[in-house]
Amino acid sequence: MDAFTDFSILADGLASLGDESSHTILAEFSPSILDGPFVADSAPLTEAPCNHDQIADYGSYCVVA
């Protein structure tokens, strides 16, 4: 499974949460997600820790939704 597929599965999970936006979703991605086009094109990295506006924790970085 590649990083994009992992992200798609996570996005589906987020959609199923509905209005429960206070939940923090943490997911482990392969290192390739940090080098991939998704992050470069549409998801700026921020310093950890993640909060409910951010969907993935990778080491000391978060991928912002």
UniProtKB/Swiss-Prot annotation:
Q: Which GO terms describe its cellular component?
A: plasma membrane
Localisation: Cell membrane
From the record, give the cysteines joined by S-S bonds: none
Q: Where is the lipid attached (S-farnesyl cysteine)?
A: C62
Keyword annotations? Cell membrane, Lipoprotein, Membrane, Methylation, Pheromone, Prenylation
InterPro entries referenced in this protein's UniProt entry, alphabetically:
Pheromone
Which positions correspond to the propeptide? 63-65
Membrane-related topology note: Lipid-anchor
| Top-level taxon of the source organism | Eukaryota
Q: Name one GO molecular function term.
A: mating pheromone activity
Pfam families, A to Z: Pheromone
Modification type Cysteine methyl ester: residues? C62
Give the protein's function.
Activates B-regulated development.
Protein name, as recorded: Mating-type pheromone BBP1(2)
Which species does this protein come from?
Schizophyllum commune (Split gill fungus)
Query: What's the gene?
Result: BBP1(2)
